[in-house]
């Protein structure tokens, strides 16, 4: 039986100790390790308040494509990707304090809730060598520029007016 409430929860919800109804994913369950948070999560699952659902491959693919566009694919954990994919699939709201998750949620047209302050605008990121300025679609091996040997950093893309 699916819940009427369409809220997909990430691990921060359980770590903060919220008694809440919604959905979560297997990877989020795996992420919750501390004893008190684990007890809360297991109690919410056994009471039926929280349903654990695995997102479809199609939804995961859509989320990964959006994360590639924003440049955040390397910053999102498998649990983050699952949370976004499940919310995308269920047309649900995401409950997360993770700015990267919020950013990709907004790109996907998903609403989100936070325990703290959320993002104000979408930021697209890119990998840039701090030495020669070369731009990369993904982090080069070891985080080092193959051209000049300098470190590569993730920075916001400049907004065009």
From Swiss-Prot:
GO terms for cellular component: preribosome, small subunit precursor. Residues 5-103 form the PINc domain. Mn(2+) binds at residue 10. Residues 124-159 are annotated as: Zinc ribbon. Its cofactor is Mn(2+); Zn(2+). Its EC number is 3.1.-.-. Pfam families: PIN_6. Binds 1 zinc ion per subunit. Keywords: Endonuclease, Hydrolase, Manganese, Metal-binding, Nuclease, Ribosome biogenesis, RNA-binding, rRNA-binding, Toxin-antitoxin system, Zinc. One of its GO terms (molecular function) is RNA endonuclease activity. Residues 118-123 are annotated as: Flexible linker. InterPro entries: NOB1, PIN-like_dom_sf, PIN_dom, Ribonuclease_PIN, VapC_family. One of its GO terms (biological process) is maturation of SSU-rRNA. Zn(2+) binds at residues 129, 132, 145, 148. Toxic component of a type II toxin-antitoxin (TA) system. Processes pre-16S-rRNA at its 3' end (the D-site) to yield the mature 3' end. PANTHER family: RNA-BINDING PROTEIN NOB1. Has 2 structurally independent domains; the N-terminal PINc domain which binds Mn(2+), rRNA substrate and probably has endoribonuclease activity, and the C-terminal zinc ribbon domain which also binds rRNA substrate. Belongs to the PINc/VapC protein family. This is Endoribonuclease Nob1. It comes from Pyrococcus abyssi (strain GE5 / Orsay).
